[in-house]
Amino acid sequence: MKNEYLLLTPGPLSTSETVREAMLKDWCTWDDEYNKDIVEVIRTKLVKLATQQDGYTSVLMQGSGTASVEATIGSAIAKEGKLLVVDNGAYGARIAQIADYLNIPCHVVSPGETSQPHLNEVETALASDPAITHVAIVHCETTTGMLNPIEAFASVAKAHGKVVILDAMSSFGGIPIDIAELGIDFMISSANKCIQGVPGFGFVIAKQTELEKCQGQARSLSLDLYDQWHCMEVNHGKWRFTSPTHTVRAFYQALLELEQEGGIEARHNRYQTNQKTLVAGMRSLGFEPLLNDELHSPIITSFYSPTHSDYQFKAFYTRLKEQGFVIYPGKVSNADCFRIGNIGEVYPADIERLIGAIEKAMYWQVA
């Protein structure tokens, strides 16, 4: 079945027809053909995508990507631990909110939504507060499309002996990284992002020695990261509680299609071409990106809304959807913006068609 429109969003996103077709079969969660032949293969493939080094493992968690973030924050940090988190958008702020809900002491570094973190501020905080045990940062902050400097951030954190948590929700699978080389201890992502699967579960790729330290520390039963991992390890892919079987099978297919495309490097190149084509086309129509070009990610781009008094996002959105494209509203607190994603089953030719559709949808310029 063909889609009626293209989702130009940061996830859920447009998937291939073959990924959707993979969900047409039912699976028994007790069978080896599901646990060993699908779940365990997924776990192995994820680790290989994340690093070429040994010592890492992966665990899948039911729910949204945020559930996997909460599972990590709530399991990795001991009762006497403290978190430092970079908040330069809604998703960094969400990590701080999770820590607050779980009564985990948290130091927040807030450079603002359109700025990268100042590493000297992070350095000062870590040097002056030995109680901080863990640090967390979002790789691609989809509030704006900002790509944060994770290599430099992790280097500072490791120089102070901290455990590093990376929210790579909207970047893993679309931007090449080696988490072992960067010194990342826990990396979190989701099925419905750059791997191009569908919603239903997230996953954590972790240094096994750090994951094993999580035993007995979880602040939630269903979000116990260690217990979920241990169950999968001992029972060859078995989940503790009901697994989203159709989503898992679709994700397996999506991983195969990532390999067929040429891996993360090839997908990154496609996303980057999409983004550059988008920005050039939007500028030709008079739109300007929120961020400076050097801060852009290939994942999603924020654009300033037109200042014309007749412009309304909902009307603009509706006109685009009628032409087969769905975009995202803005999420920045101090600027009127909208966002356009470049990921999913989307190609440069689609972006070129989008630019034509946007030109037709600019009703406020009609005389």
Curated annotation (Swiss-Prot):
Pfam family, one: Aminotran_5
Swiss-Prot/TrEMBL cofactor(s): pyridoxal 5'-phosphate
UniProt-recorded Gene Ontology molecular function terms: 2-aminoethylphosphonate-pyruvate transaminase activity
Keyword match Transferase: yes
Record carries keyword Transferase: yes
Catalytically driven reaction(s): (2-aminoethyl)phosphonate + pyruvate = phosphonoacetaldehyde + L-alanine
InterPro entries xrefs: Aminotrans_V_dom (IPR000192), NH2EtPonate_pyrv_transaminase (IPR012703), PyrdxlP-dep_Trfase (IPR015424), PyrdxlP-dep_Trfase_major (IPR015421), PyrdxlP-dep_Trfase_small (IPR015422), SP_NH2Trfase/AEP_transaminase (IPR024169)
EC number: 2.6.1.37
First-tier enzyme category under EC: transferase
GO biological process, any: organic phosphonate catabolic process
Modified residues (N6-(pyridoxal phosphate)lysine): 193
Keywords: Aminotransferase, Pyridoxal phosphate, Pyruvate, Transferase
Function recorded in the entry: Involved in phosphonate degradation.
Assigned protein family: Belongs to the class-V pyridoxal-phosphate-dependent aminotransferase family. PhnW subfamily.
Subunit-structure text: Homodimer.
Name this polypeptide is given: 2-aminoethylphosphonate--pyruvate transaminase
Species name: Vibrio vulnificus (strain CMCP6)
